[in-house]
Swiss-Prot record:
It is a multi-pass membrane protein. GO terms for molecular function: neutral L-amino acid:sodium symporter activity. This is Serine/threonine transporter SstT. Coiled coil: none annotated. One of its GO terms (cellular component) is plasma membrane. InterPro entries: Na-dicarboxylate_symporter, Na:dicarbo_symporter_sf, Ser_Thr_transp_SstT. It is found in: Cell inner membrane. The chain crosses the membrane at residues 16-36, 46-66, 84-104, 143-163, 180-200, 219-239, 300-320, 332-352. It comes from the Bacteria. Belongs to the dicarboxylate/amino acid:cation symporter (DAACS) (TC 2.A.23) family. It comes from Citrobacter koseri (strain ATCC BAA-895 / CDC 4225-83 / SGSC4696). HAMAP family: Ser_Thr_transp_SstT. Its main location: membrane. Pfam families: SDF.
Length: 414
């Protein structure tokens, strides 16, 4: 009888909600880190394997899905990419503006020391744009190997349009290939609880949070900005699209996309998770197969917050006065920098010197600010990725649902 009960419990755990399984993995990871540090460090391999599997399958998934959706696209069918792109840009700018307001209300200062990183940041916005343009014309094999999603998108779109003129057998083959890759992705995602367990246990065992206490106020400002954007600004933008209570959708995206992104700390690795959630929400495949990988490269609200908050912290530390027009200009610059973050090694942190340059802050000091960013990266990068990645699904779903509602109203009127 006891054996039957235990096997029944195990079966419910295995076949139950993935979110609940991830929560169990999270709790077990914390407990293991508290009980045995060496064992927790050893489980880091599970997390590394999970993130590696997601990163490996994501480029192929994007290529096949986009190629298949465009190749099989019916003439006259609407994909809603333009309004989604506008929401991405508006969301990123709103996040930067929020960070400016919060930084004005709660100014933070830094303890600057000697530079702690030898990574070379881009010298200006021209170099960022140059990097993005070079990503567009990248070799397709190199783009797949290096997970260059801008290059992958360009090649997938080009091949998709070319395959529109092929016979139906070829189109079916491309579609079947896309379905096969999607099946592998679903298989990988089922291992998320084990991966999260390994990531949480090893992170707590190796780094802990003791190094973060010295930057408590800065972290509170950063995470506070991200919380405001996630729970106030984004729901407002979603409401303007769907014209009803946005929180069921917002909380679903945060729970099923944001949690995974928080622990993997990779928008690229979270693309398969987002694709799976879009399918679960019954969104238009032609739309989300393009908007999700596009969002992973240009929808960077979290990055805009990081760039703005750390730049203003450096400004306050050095006693540089900031007026309202300059703060607004910083919001624009931070938004542009954030959109280019995917094309820069080191992401948003390495674009801080570019924003600091607005205030005449020397590169040596700006790189010290970057070093602070790396110190708080355990939380900063996790929260940033969670808000970036969950917003990709959120805005895609909002636009798709708004379009479905519009079509339903039109059908009723006619």
């Amino acid at each position: 009888m006891t054996t039957q009960r235990s096997s029944g419990l195990l079966q419910r755990l295995v076949q139950g909600s993935l979110v609940k399984q991830i929560l169990i993995g999270l709790i077990l990871g914390i407990l293991l880190a508290l009980v045995s540090k060496p064992a927790a460090e050893a489980t880091g391999l599970l997390g590394t394997l999970f993130v590696g599997a997601l990163k490996a399958v994501a480029p192929v998934l994007v290529l096949t899905l986009v190629m298949a959706s465009i190749a099989n696209h019916q003439h006259g069918q609407k994909t809603n990419i333009r309004p989604i792109l506008w929401m991405y840009l508006l969301g990123t700018f709103s996040a930067a503006l929020t960070a400016v307001v919060v930084s004005f209300l709660f100014p933070s200062t830094l303890q600057l020391t000697t530079g702690a990183t030898d990574i070379t940041p881009p010298s200006g916005i021209v170099q960022v744009i140059h990097g993005l343009l070079m990503s567009i014309v990248a070799n397709p094999i190199h783009a797949l190997i290096n997970a260059n999603y801008i290059g992958i998108l360009v090649w997938a779109i080009g091949l998709g349009f070319a395959l529109r003129h092929s016979n139906q057998t070829t189109k079916n083959l491309v579609n079947d290939l896309s379905d096969a890759v999607t099946f592998i992705v679903k298989l990988v995602i089922r291992f998320a609880p084990i991966g999260i367990f390994g990531l949480v246990a090893s992170t707590l065992a190796t780094t802990g949070f003791s190094a973060l206490w010295g930057y408590a106020q800065l972290l509170l400002v950063l995470i506070g900005c991200m919380a405001i954007v996630a729970l106030v600004i984004n729901p407002l933008l979603v409401f303007l699209q769907i014209r009803r209570n946005p929180y069921p959708l917002v909380l679903t995206c945060l729970r099923e996309s944001g949690v995974t992104a928080f622990f993997t700390r990779s928008s690229a690795a979270n693309i398969p998770v987002n694709m799976s959630l879009c399918e679960k929400l019954n969104l238009d495949r032609d739309t989300y197969s393009v908007s999700i990988p596009l969002g992973a490269t240009v929808n960077m609200a979290g990055a805009a917050i990081t760039i703005t908050v750390l730049t203003l912290a450096a400004v306050y530390t050095l006693g540089i006065p900031v007026d309202l027009p300059t703060a607004l200009l910083l919001s624009v610059v931070a938004s542009l920098c954030a959109c280019g973050a995917s094309g820069v090694a080191g992401g948003s942190l390495l674009l801080i010197p570019l924003a600091c340059n607005m205030f005449g802050i020397p590169n040596e000091i700006a790189m010290q600010v970057v070093a602070v960013g790396f110190i708080i990266g355990v939380l900063q990068d996790s929260c940033e990725t969670a808000i970036n990645s969950s917003t990709d699904v959120m805005f895609t779903a909002a636009v798709c649902q708004a379009e479905d509602a519009r079509l339903a109203k039109s059908a009723l009127r006619s």
